[in-house]
Amino acid sequence: MRILGILLAQALVLSAAQADVKGNWKRHVVWEGLHNNVAVAADFTGDGKVDIISNAGNKTRLFVAPDWKEVIIGDHMDHNFIHGETFDVDGDGDADFIGARYQPGLIVWFEQPNKNAAAGPWKARIAEDEIIGIHGVLKADVNGDGKLDLLANSAQPKGKFPDSAVWLEVPKNPRLAKRWTRHVFAKNDAPGLSHYLGAGDLNGDGRLDITLAAKGGPSDKSGKGEWFAWWEAGKDPTRPFRKHLLPGKHPGATNILPADVNGDGKLDIIASRGHGTGLIWYENPSWKIHDINTELLSSHCLQVGDIDGDGDIDAATCAYISRKAAWFENDGKGRFTTHIIHDDQAAYDIRLVDMDGDGDLDTLIAGQRSKNVVWFENPLRNP
């Protein structure tokens, strides 16, 4: 009854915001049928069109644009992924896929076939299988060598790397390597069931720092969650980073991404409470908290980018309990207006991608409770 009351109150607040929507975001259904936690997009087939890879029911599927032909590229009982990434792992010029399972921890990379991505199964290889509680993965060049690495958390308080987080360095020959090279940047100092990661140079020293959030709540036996934090990189990125806890107690904290919100040249932080309520941003360097939205329940995914093409950073989410897809318009100074994209879509994962090649950022959503994969077409540059 309490959740129902919250949802009804929220509906009244968000209906007012809905009147300010700039155009109608056309909904494109790619696939329906099962619970989806992850969807990524890239031109996997090399034809200039953006394709999609998602995972549901232990099957990893490639959907080929523009008609979204379904190709099973992986079918394995162990491949129930909660998050994923895509980049060229093996350096052969095409995009590969990375899937992460929560528990027991497992990260698998799928090698795209060189000749025909849509021909059938892709070769799957293990990148990591010793960290436990992998809720988020993120590509980033951590050591500054010009090659992408992979960030991942080890959220569970057990195993070899309890309450920790790592970055994985791709081996010189990932096709032959038994596992990727693991570096622990958060060593036993990320308790409370951490979720998703972010990366950026927060202190302006030229090194890549890492952000992380922990939800806390009833399932957190340590009682040490409900925080947002960043880890400062040292001269040697293979050594543990220095943790900086950000202000406030944040029940349900999940997502945290560096971005210059107010245009002052410093990276601020945008964050959401995906197992709680609301979105905020922290102003660098004081880390003063500013509200983005105080009403939205369960904004369990977050992306940042210039959605309306006005030169500043906006944000987007899709809430899995309140089933609201929304974007947040920045006025350039850190004051945000909520716009509802759709009022019956649930997600754990959202991506900002130009799906149709028209030069603006659309939203790709892996429908968790809504059991679908959809993308919403950005109308802001339509005639």
Regions found by a protein language model. Give the residues of each.
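Bacterial N-terminal signal peptides
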Residues: 5-15
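Beta-propeller-forming repeat regions
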Residues: 16-383
